[in-house]
């Protein structure tokens, strides 16, 4: 009977080739960078919305040709006005006031002057123009009025004042009318909700696309594996391989094609090693198709695509391999077979050392109780890792990774609300996977040098060529 205590997903072990020492001492620092990225993403996502583009609906007649102003007008508001804030209200901010830009130049508004929010500079400019009845030289260029250039074209600046609704008849001595304040609150809430809804929709869309690509491209996933290991599958249970006799039986039925062409005449350890490589090559192909479906990946420079896959496939494979493992063994041959952990440990050295570290990692990884939607985002984050050596467009790839890590974090919060430390635990698992790949590659290096019959598959050799 197959024990089913742990979670499962697809794939089988992977063999490595030419490699010296995969991970550098800089790795922990690199993982720190990932954590900083995720923290900054979290801060951005939970921060308040800075309202910078609000405009009132209002008009005031301008003029054609030279501008002749209305007759006198009293002074406007005090230089600075702070609006009282009700705790919990929409305009509550660290400064205790609504943070609004000047309607004319975009500088920070000091208050509600002449019927609109304006800065001290534009308030004073409008007041002087009105009081002194200034006439400015006509300008037909419709100059854009900004903080840095607002003094260059007084004609266009005054027209901007009028167009946004400034009027000497609308003086409120810096206080915002109650109706305007209510209107502003409603506008801010609407904008915030619209932006939140839009961002949430984008994040959900990204998560959905990655999850669908995961289900589409991998032959085995955790749900399928759990059903098989629990004995709930409608078809026949997996054939258990626990000794040399059952191994030979499985080779004649489950993996007959893999042990053809002379492989069947080699010793059992070499045959198992060969089957592991064949499964790994198939998984590399699946991972390549999955990566192409990650939004933005296919648009990367081809060299960067190759580099990301070259450095990421083994980490991704060992993460997904956990899903077909439990404490007693692992599924093989598309779930049709189950090879026991004890049998793998009984193989002669160095082959007996290949799978045991993967079981140790899998038990800890499976304890996180991730589902396929979690794993799909985790694998995508592994592939789109901006610290891989030799990348050409590092900035763009880091931005991709930030987006995926952000989605992963939010998805975990939603999918596992009771485990607030799950996200940092997964970041640590990224570090553990790099170490696992390092140790695996070193072991395969030993096998390559000492076992003449255990040849490496050409694709796997290419993956490890000049990797570190």
From Swiss-Prot:
Amino acids binding indeglitazar: 280, 314, 464
Stretches assigned to the NR LBD domain: 239-466
One GO-annotated biological process of the protein: positive regulation of gluconeogenesis
Post-translational note: Ubiquitinated by E3 ubiquitin-protein ligase HUWE1; leading to proteasomal degradation. Phosphorylated.
Up-regulation conditions: Down-regulated by aging.
Zinc finger (NR C4-type): 102-122, 139-161
Taxonomic superkingdom: Eukaryota
Region (Required for heterodimerization with RXRA) residue spans: 304-433
Phenotype upon changing residue 370 to R: Abolishes heterodimerization with RXRA. No DNA binding
Family, per entry: Belongs to the nuclear hormone receptor family. NR1 subfamily.
Protein name: Peroxisome proliferator-activated receptor alpha
Species assigned in the record: Homo sapiens
Native organism taxonomy: Eukaryota, Metazoa, Chordata, Craniata, Vertebrata
Underlying gene: PPARA
């Amino acid at each position: 009977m197959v024990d089913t205590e742990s979670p499962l997903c697809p794939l089988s072990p992977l063999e490595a080739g030419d490699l010296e020492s995969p991970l550098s001492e800089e790795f922990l620092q690199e993982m720190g960078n990932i954590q900083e990225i995720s923290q900054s993403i979290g801060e951005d996502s939970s921060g308040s919305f800075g309202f910078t583009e609000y405009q009132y609906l209002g008009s005031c007649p301008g003029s054609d040709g030279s501008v002749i102003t209305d007759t006198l007008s009293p002074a406007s508001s005090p230089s600075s006005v702070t609006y009282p804030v009700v705790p919990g209200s929409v305009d509550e901010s660290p400064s205790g006031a609504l943070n609004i830009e000047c309607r004319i130049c975009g500088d920070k508004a000091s208050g509600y002057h002449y019927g609109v929010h304006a800065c001290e500079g534009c308030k004073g400019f409008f007041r002087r123009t009105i009081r002194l009845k200034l006439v400015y030289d006509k300008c037909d260029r419709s100059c854009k009025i900004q903080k840095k250039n607002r003094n260059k074209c007084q004609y266009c600046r005054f027209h901007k004042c009028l167009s946004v609704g400034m009027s000497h008849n609308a003086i409120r001595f810096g206080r915002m009318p109650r109706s305007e304040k209510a209107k502003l609150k409603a506008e801010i809430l609407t904008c915030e909700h619209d932006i939140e809804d839009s961002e949430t929709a984008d994040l959900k869309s990204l998560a959905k696309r990655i999850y669908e690509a995961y289900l589409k491209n991998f032959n085995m996933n955790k749900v399928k594996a759990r059903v098989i290991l629990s004995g709930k599958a409608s078809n026949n249970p997996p054939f258990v391989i626990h000794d040399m006799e059952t191994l030979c039986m499985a080779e004649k039925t489950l993996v007959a094609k893999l042990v053809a062409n002379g492989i069947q005449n080699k010793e059992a350890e070499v045959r198992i090693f060969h089957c592991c490589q064949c499964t790994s090559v198939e998984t590399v192909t699946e991972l390549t198709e999955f990566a192409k479906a990650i939004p933005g990946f296919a648009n990367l420079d081809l060299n960067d695509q190759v580099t990301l896959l070259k450095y990421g496939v083994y980490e991704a494979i060992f993460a997904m391999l956990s899903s077909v493992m439990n404490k007693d063994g692992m599924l093989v041959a598309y779930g049709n077979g189950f090879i026991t952990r004890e049998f793998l440990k009984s193989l002669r050295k160095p082959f007996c050392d290949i799978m045991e570290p993967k079981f140790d990692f899998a038990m800890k990884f499976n304890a996180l109780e991730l589902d396929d939607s979690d794993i799909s985002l985790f694998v995508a984050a592994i592939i789109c890792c901006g610290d891989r050596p030799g990348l050409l467009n590092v900035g763009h790839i880091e931005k991709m990774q930030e987006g995926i890590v952000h989605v992963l974090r939010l998805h975990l919060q939603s999918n596992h609300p009771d485990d607030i430390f799950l996200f940092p635990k997964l970041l640590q698992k990224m570090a553990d996977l790099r170490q696992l790949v390092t140790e695996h590659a070193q072991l395969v290096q030993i096998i390559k040098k000492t076992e003449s019959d255990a040849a490496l598959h050409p694709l796997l050799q290419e993956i490890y060529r000049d990797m570190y």
